[in-house]
A protein has these predicted regions:
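Conserved hydrophobic core/spine positions of the Hanks-type protein kinase catalytic domain
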Residues: 122-125
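C-lobe/activation-segment region of protein kinase-like
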Residues: 149-233
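Conserved protein kinase catalytic/activation segment
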Residues: 140-152
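Catalytic-loop of the protein kinase fold
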Residues: 128-139
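Juxta-kinase regulatory segment immediately upstream of eukaryotic protein kinase catalytic domains
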Residues: 8-29
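ATP-binding glycine-rich loop module of kinase domains
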Residues: 27-70, 74-77
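Active-site beta-strand termini and strand-to-loop segments that position acidic
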Residues: 41-45, 100, 145-146
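Conserved structural core of kinase catalytic domains
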Residues: 65, 77-80, 84-118
Length: 233
């Protein structure tokens, strides 16, 4: 992915800019900025990494942005050593540093069938560690890594609980459903009967979300905050 940092987030490349919380002796490129903060590609002589920064968020949204960032921190700590998940490098009150995953979005590099097997292995590891991503409908949260395997980023909305808790099991099932939706988009003929049954059975949470909170969420994020989340079908 080196040389095409904007691909990491599915956004357009932006010119290098200064970052108040980025190393002063390195270089930074702004990859994304929205109502909940900024994401930077940071480089120095020894390494390249990603920094999420929330210090510039409007004061009334800052507590929410900090809470989401700390949720990502907790998730990454639980997922240390899982292939295809960024490593937590450092964090502070208003920033979080994580390792860079070299790869491209699903739109930029349509995944091969083997990629979906790799993605399912990641989801099994997440559930085993007590984490559900909770935002995998978005194509940009999945990566096709340079070796062809799967990668997952952006754990701000993750659900963290004991693996056997009903909520965790429910949300892990929704993660799998969203992966199968992407499989249907790229390899419909490869769907197994069990995959089709799972896609057809939307959980009570998914039904309630679509009928009630999703509408309010879309109004808040798109009309009030001007954030387009790129959620998949």
């Amino acid at each position: 992915m080196r040389g095409r940092p904007a691909s990491f987030l599915g956004g357009r490349r932006m010119a290098p800019q200064s970052c108040a919380t980025a190393p002063s002796d390195g270089s930074t490129v702004l990859l994304k900025r929205d109502a909940f903060g900024a994401v930077w590609l940071c480089r120095d002589d020894a390494r390249t990494w990603i920094r999420r920064e929330v210090g510039s968020v409007r004061w009334w949204l800052r507590p929410l942005a900090r809470a989401a960032m700390q949720r990502e921190r907790r998730a990454l700590l639980r997922l240390r050593g899982v292939d295809g998940v960024p490593r937590l490098l450092a964090n502070g009150c208003d920033h979080l540093d994580r390792s860079l995953l070299e790869g491209a979005t699903l739109a930029e590099r349509p995944p091969e069938l083997e990629w979906f097997r790799s993605a399912r292995r990641i989801l099994r590891q997440l559930r085993h560690r007590g984490v559900a991503h909770n935002d995998l409908a978005k194509e940009q949260n999945w990566l096709v890594l340079d070796d062809g395997g799967a990668g997952v980023v952006d754990f701000q909305l993750a659900v963290i609980a004991r693996p056997r808790r009903p909520l965790l099991r429910l949300m892990a099932r929704e993660d799998l459903r969203h992966l199968l939706k992407h499989k249907r988009a790229f390899h419909r003929a490869a769907l197994r009967p069990v995959d089709r049954r799972l896609l057809a059975r939307r959980s009570w949470f998914a039904r309630a979300w679509r009928q009630t909170w999703k509408r309010a969420y879309n109004v808040m994020t798109r009309r009030v905050l001007g954030v387009r989340d790129g959620e998949g079908t």
